Amino acid sequence: MNANPKFLSADARVDAAAVAPLPNSRKVYVTGSQPDIRVPMREITQADTPTSFGGEKNPPIYVYDTSGPYTDPDAKIDIRAGLPALRQRWIDARGDTETLAGLTSDYGRERAADPATAELRFPGLHRHPRRAKAGKNVTQMHYARQGIITPEMEYIAIRENQRRAEYLESLKASGPNGAKLAAMMGRQHAGQAFGAAAFGANAPAEITPEFVRDEVARGRAIIPANINHPETEPMIIGRNFLVKINANIGNSAVTSSIGEEVDKMTWAIRWGGDTVMDLSTGKHIHETREWIIRNSPVPIGTVPIYQALEKVNGKAEDLTWEIFRDTLIEQAEQGVDYFTIHAGVRLQYVPLTANRMTGIVSRGGSIMAKWCLAHHKESFLYEHFEEICEIMKAYDVSFSLGDGLRPGSIYDANDEAQLGELKTLGELTQIAWKHDVQVMIEGPGHVPMQLIKENMDLQLDWCKEAPFYTLGPLTTDIAPGYDHITSGIGAAMIGWFGTAMLCYVTPKEHLGLPNKDDVKEGIITYKLAAHAADLAKGHPGAQVRDNALSKARFEFRWQDQFNLGLDPDKAREFHDETLPKDSAKVAHFCSMCGPHFCSMKITQDVREFAAQQGVSENDALKKGMEVKAVEFVKSGSEIYHRQ
């Protein structure tokens, strides 16, 4: 991508579609033990139940909100200035970091001094980068292992609970039937958490700051939060917490601009992206990343080898440890929260891919495989892994240990190359934990349904319960254009089995670079998969939103049905295609069945008839059938009648 004349930093504006509040929703904040712990949630208001159905109050539902200040009407949004440094005071108070005089990476200094990039550079506040003081470790894992509950951990505990207790109390206080209503709306099917006996899959009824600390200390969860990304709202990735999703964005050599990528980021978090990976491979990667980080309230991940490759003009064999090291420092000083590093692609595994249908499909994996073969040497990522850990813990960058040998077709699933790399990732995890560096493990890929659980079981065993982060997996290879669905099936399954974060797949997978519409489609599909996994695991409170929507559906509260859904806009659009009038929003039927065949309307009629007759619903059904039988005989006992 050349300097795009359509993007000038002086003209940059936030995407208007990303800042509009969702229908019947407002941003609320829950305050923690200190005033600056203000945890955002989305409050969805509901209409009262119609008097014909009992006329009760329906209190607001609270849902997890990843949109940051963008959907807060009281926030002043200026992407040229960036977001407020929410965590800055917490970082300062710990007293274990130092502010550097300037950038220390060679490339970072070059870009800052290059007049050719001046019109593209982020113009807002340029903070001096921070780094751990000599001899200090500033990772959330280190604090957790010292028994310290950080403000980030308290923030996360409040966020994960989603005000569920307050919601149930408001139901109890709603009227004479409040206790019964709370019991009904809080009801949840028992889940099945796989591996609970052998591994710690056991979320408590209420998430506490101490529970967060303990899970991070054990390595079962990570809090990606670089000290140079103070704008981020703390979140957690771990299988005893809500399943999270990641959205990939990024330019390429042939398409997109900085402005488009910032728009994709704000669009992705509006619809529920918990983290965003900037996978840019075109020019101006450094400047694009700075704009994204300074405006992102969610953790940002990257694959540093992509930018390192650009620095050697795309020739993998010219890569060196020194170039890669400088790239790590450059990105850590900008504020990247987690790095995908393909240190498990070892020379000995490359020949194992020779008999594959689709070979090595990971870009990072193929880069390192080519380097290993060109030099006939062990990967410099593997050889220098301890040094990488030293860099990571100086900034609190988390590892996302890359699956460079993941299968690119179901034909190649669970083969020797994939599983050999997974074992190595387990060994590297132990090394990282020795440095108190946070780790998650990346997983496949393309895997048929019957082989998915094996992936999860082996990962838990070999990687000692480090969080699993998977791309799908795609369960079939026959649906280009629909791979958000082929992968959504696998994502729901592996999330149920224990995966902590799901990397979204858009309809453009294997076909092209996703646009904003594709990003939304991928996000919604994966929010659905993650939620289905939470339900299947029996995660506390996971069913509250389902119950609220089902109640709204039964009571024909159409607007509430739309607003409680993952995509209110699409739900309303589909309803309006056949019933566009406002009167249809209060009708006791929809266009699918019409007024005479609506099953829920028939059920309501039965209940009304039962109340009028003073009998139970079962007796009412029996009595109603007797009346209809008499009518049938009187009409001549004919099944069909000519009109």
From Swiss-Prot:
One of its GO terms (biological process) is thiamine diphosphate biosynthetic process. Zn(2+) binds at H446, H510. Catalyzes the synthesis of the hydroxymethylpyrimidine phosphate (HMP-P) moiety of thiamine from aminoimidazole ribotide (AIR) in a radical S-adenosyl-L-methionine (SAM)-dependent reaction. Pathway: Cofactor biosynthesis; thiamine diphosphate biosynthesis. Belongs to the ThiC family. Its EC number is 4.1.99.17. Homodimer. GO terms for molecular function: 4 iron, 4 sulfur cluster binding; carbon-carbon lyase activity; zinc ion binding. It is an enzyme of class 4 (lyase). Substrate binds at N248, M277, Y306, H342, S362, R363, G364, D403, G404, L405, R406, E442, Y469. It holds the Pfam family ThiC-associated. HAMAP family: ThiC (MF_00089). Binds 1 [4Fe-4S] cluster per subunit. The cluster is coordinated with 3 cysteines and an exchangeable S-adenosyl-L-methionine. This is Phosphomethylpyrimidine synthase. It catalyses: 5-amino-1-(5-phospho-beta-D-ribosyl)imidazole + S-adenosyl-L-methionine = 4-amino-2-methyl-5-(phosphooxymethyl)pyrimidine + CO + 5'-deoxyadenosine + formate + L-methionine + 3 H(+). One of its GO terms (cellular component) is cytosol. [4Fe-4S] cluster binds at C590, C593, C598. Keywords: 4Fe-4S, Iron, Iron-sulfur, Lyase, Metal-binding, S-adenosyl-L-methionine, Thiamine biosynthesis, Zinc. The keyword S-adenosyl-L-methionine applies. Its cofactor is [4Fe-4S] cluster.
